[in-house]
Regions:
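Intrinsically disordered, low-complexity, positively biased terminal segments
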Residues: 4-252
């Protein structure tokens, strides 16, 4: 219990709800709209989300001072362990309130276990940062159609138009193989089109996916040789791509 966050006062409160309650869906929908990589769940996706859970799974929702749901924790308790299936929050008050709820169980548990995403600074937020963390592969992503992907990708706005000529390497999808000109307008709209000229800059479709999905930054990928490009190009990509770690708690 020394590692659990100390109770901190928040303006809202946490209440247990049924796992099929509308508050859970409402909270998640708001969360997904500002969280990079989160699945937009329809009824089928929610059914899949609960498919393999036991009847012991419970849910608790944090309500703000306006009685609006701002976060939730899905959990179960077994063998003196508080298992967290999922915890989401739309602001810091909700995060604090949910951890207050978890900490309130300290007298009946020996430890807390759960899953979160890479780079979540969980240890930093605890009273004692000496915790065991294990990184496990969970999902694999792939850009199937690069030109179509770029059309819908939300680049950062800028005061200048930007462009990058490069060779994209994809041994599987012919539509992604070849030289491209990527243009990014001032309002952040991207467009990729094929060009018939050799390019010094090179990147594989795997690295492109890693970069655009936010798993690794352009500067790091260039440092380890996964992107061949001039320093000013890497700086442009750093500025154009949002710095958000992807999060997904669904499995299908």
């Amino acid at each position: 219990d020394y590692q659990l966050p100390k109770n901190r006062q928040v303006p809202g409160d946490v209440r247990r709800v049924k796992t099929d309650s509308a508050e859970l869906k409402e909270t998640y929908e708001r969360y997904a709209m500002h969280t990079h990589g989160a699945v937009l769940r329809d009824d089928l996706a929610w059914n899949e989300y609960w498919l393999w859970d036991s009847d012991d799974v419970m849910a608790a929702v944090y309500y703000n001072e306006k009685n609006e749901p701002d976060g939730y924790v899905i959990y179960w308790i077994a063998n003196d362990v508080f298992h967290i299936k999922d915890m989401i929050f739309n602001n810091e008050d909700a995060r604090t309130g949910l951890w207050n709820f978890v900490s309130a169980h300290f007298s009946m548990i020996d430890q807390v276990e759960g899953d979160t995403y890479t780079d979540e600074p969980l240890a930093f937020l605890l009273e004692d940062a000496s915790i065991k963390e294990v990184i496990s592969p969970y999902f694999m992503g792939r850009i199937v159609d690069f030109e179509a992907f770029v059309e819908d990708y939300p680049f950062r706005p800028s005061v200048l138009d930007r462009e990058w000529k490069f060779t994209l390497m994809d041994p599987v999808m012919e539509c992604n193989q070849g030289s491209f000109l990527l243009t990014i307008s001032r309002d952040g709209h991207g467009q990729a089109r094929r060009i018939m000229e050799p390019c010094e800059d090179k990147i594989s479709i795997q690295t492109m996916t890693t970069m655009l999905m936010g798993y690794k930054r352009p500067e790091y990928l260039a440092k380890i040789g996964r992107i061949q490009a001039a320093e000013w190009t890497i700086d442009m990509l750093e500025d154009a791509i949002e710095q958000q770690t992807p999060y997904i708690s669904d499995y299908f």
